Amino acid sequence: SQEEENEQMGMYDEDENRLFKNTDTNGRFHSDWCSMIYSRLMLARNLLTEDGVIFISIDDNEEDNLKKICDEVFGAVNYVATFPWRKRTAKSDVPFGVSQDYEYILCFAKASNFAASVEGKERKYYETPDFAGRPWRVHDLTKQTTASERPNSYFTIVNPKTGAQYPANPNRTWAITEDTFRTYYVENRIVFPGDYDFLNIQKPVLRYWKADDMKKAGDKFGKVAVSTKLPDNIGMSQDGTKEITNLLGAKAFSFPKPAALIKYLISISSEEGDFVLDFFSGSATTAHAVMQLNAEDGGHRKFIMVQLPEKCDEASEAYKAGYKNICEIGKERIRRAGMKIKDNLEQNGTDIQYLHKELK
């Protein structure tokens, strides 16, 4: 609770007088921050499923400390990646003449069986009369190795039907040995030039069956690995501000993440029925992102938002707009974003129900 955190940090005396804020002028600033985040990460790890994953956004000030803490809590072997996110365009009036425009999204898994993925470009499979009901694709049969590196793969392939010869390139040998070629030929896994009119190939290629691809890939079939370079269309902090201003009619929250950023992270790491927990909910961007992603892919993800009822400054736009604490901002955003998404779906002929529950 907020009270427990204040007690741990020694922020009040016995008469409940505030002693200090945890600002960067506090000599124990980093230690206090580390103590606060450590306890929350321990709880987060306990709540993760075995194939679960956590994303944590941080700026330069604590990125190094956060990585060390996460290595201890989740294990260094479960570090997935760091995604640099550009939060703003460069500013000129900055210390040392360097504009710090990025935050860093650290990703850790509960266990090593997690794998991020995105929908990949669909592979081209062919259906031919000679293999009815067995779609197949082709793959290069060469490898980036020289004849001296792989002498067993430096040989001439001969088409048993036509006698046509295909010598290996000394700078790029075959990916298989001569014995393996014979085995693959018997298994119908070698495709030669001229076998199919629709294939424009100049040398033998390898045939892969779609059924084998599906068996090997399992749930990840049709998907590819993701890059730490985030997509260009996920937005910056100013886009997050526009979103919440358009929804609530006021700049009710400072520096909110754009929903597109959170939606992308959820899309690469979750299944359609997963739970998504955000225990620094703020303006409830995560809830907005979950609802939007569900609307787009037909998923049934549920979200849990956790936020202390921190009071809004009376001089802030949020307070003037009627929001007394941050929780009220988040609840109203969830309501309005949910109704907007619902209206958009119904305009497209989709009938959905909107349900809101609050636990106290």
Language-model features: locations:
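Beta-strand segments within the central parallel beta-sheet cores of soluble alpha/beta enzyme folds
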Residues: 81-84, 281, 302-305
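A glycine-rich phosphate-binding loop feature that marks nucleotide/adenosyl-phosphate handling sites
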Residues: 123, 198-206, 281-284, 350-359
